[in-house]
């Protein structure tokens, strides 16, 4: 069965490479599919089930709306490429329920989470080849007591991972029997824990480089991915204490093959590696902040120009920021109808303050006798 899946993937991949070389359009065999097609919905269901099974903590995701779908097929199998929005549910990760038995979390983020998935389907086998859901800014929640000694998830694009990844890859290259050095391919998951220093736990995969160990004692800027693709995925634990000026301790366990595609991971931006500079994320955040500020000013101006919008009584609950689109607007019924209606909690307006009770009006002036209680 696994052999059939590999052959199907190989055929589709070969067609993708063969098409442009023959002067044809890229991926000519990939065609649009109906968003409300039963097979497309089944592909999304498989992707969400697989994604939720791999969540280490938090809450499961459920389908909100299928945005776009396409498929590529041959005589033996069909691959579906789907884009959809999801929402956080009230079912915890690792529970017995599947997402179809859950409800949207009322306190979840109003903005849905965009997801992409690639699913292989044939008469004899169904398999999720890749699924990824882009995280969105978490809603503000009540403060909880901080666990100072517990592992904390950190962003896979954080600069703090540069040294732990470098130690891990260096350790692998020193211990492996490969004739070539390996370089970073993608990072899947990372946590940091305060111990006698910092303990990093990493999930990542690497790719063989063009630098042989005979010609290069260690990795350098001349090392690039080798055309002969060879991958290895690793779990690494790195203990560092920079203030003690001690050599970091890295425990790396690796196996051949890529990191599972359905695990939550991001591929590094082009040009990033432990040996290269990071992108200027601060500049991006500054740009986003200025854009948000401009939107707020524009919103305030529009409210001043239309006072009727402010005085409207009993407003309806706010809809999601990505409003559902009717299927009739697209010939392929995309986006699809929402799986369930999401109604975020409404913020009650504070009661209008009561005007202070007016003091009694004294027509005649007070005398000293009045203050003494004498008439």
Curated annotation (Swiss-Prot):
Glycosylation sites recorded in the entry for this protein: 74, 235
Keyword tags: Cleavage on pair of basic residues, Cytoplasm, Disulfide bond, Glycoprotein, Protease inhibitor, Signal, Thiol protease inhibitor, Vacuole
Record's signal peptide: 1-23
Keyword Cytoplasm set for record: yes
GO biological process: negative regulation of blood coagulation; positive regulation of cytosolic calcium ion concentration
Cystine pairings recorded for this chain: 91-102, 115-133, 211-223, 234-254
GO cellular component terms listed in the entry, alphabetical order: blood microparticle; cytoplasm; vacuole
Keyword Glycoprotein: yes
Pfam families in the record: Cystatin (PF00031)
Location of region: Disordered: 283-375
Tissue specificity statement from the Swiss-Prot or TrEMBL entry: Expressed in the skin, liver, intestine, spleen, pancreas and kidney.
SUPFAM superfamilies documented for this protein: Cystatin/monellin
Chain ranges of the Cystatin kininogen-type domain: 35-139, 156-260
Protein function: Inhibits papain and ficin (cysteine proteinases) but not trypsin (a serine proteinase).
Protein name, as recorded: Kininogen
Annotated organism of origin: Salmo salar (Atlantic salmon)
Gene: LOC106584303
